[in-house]
Amino acid sequence: MLSQWQPVKEKLVFKNVITEKIMKLGCFSISLAVKDLKKSKAFYEKIGFEVFAGEESHGFLIMKHEDTNIGLFQGMFEKNILTFNPGWNQNAENVESFDDVRELLEQIKSKGIEIAEESISGEQGPSSFSIIDPDGNPILIDQHV
């Protein structure tokens, strides 16, 4: 019977459900396609965001407010993108234990999810791929380490 709960490692799980490995997707941010980088920067600063990476001269800024990250990108893509960075925490600092983007790619493929774009190089290090959710929202898995 699946209606009974059993505590496991401080979490509640169904008693008879087979669990699978939870993917470690890394740092989450939303990458916003903006029309005017300076105006967008000024707007987000008014609501508490601060620049912590990127360069206006390169057409992008990464901004942070507490544990929330946003990227402002002018002229780089058409739609907003949900972005995950394996190997980074929410402060864009390297973490020791993470699922490599190549492993995540195989897990995603094994679930029957279509890969929209794939840019994998070598057996480790920076690489990326993207998928599209059922509503057409792009999701980028982008490893920098």
What are the functions of these language-model segments?
Residues 11-41, 144-145:
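N-terminal beta-strand motif that seeds the catalytic metal site of vicinal oxygen chelate
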Residues 24, 31-76:
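Core segments of cupin and vicinal oxygen chelate
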Residues 57, 75, 121, 142-144:
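Residue-level structural signal for beta-strand termini and adjacent loop
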Residues 35-38, 76-77, 85-135:
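Vicinal oxygen chelate
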Residues 70-73, 130, 139-140:
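Conserved beta-strand in the GNAT
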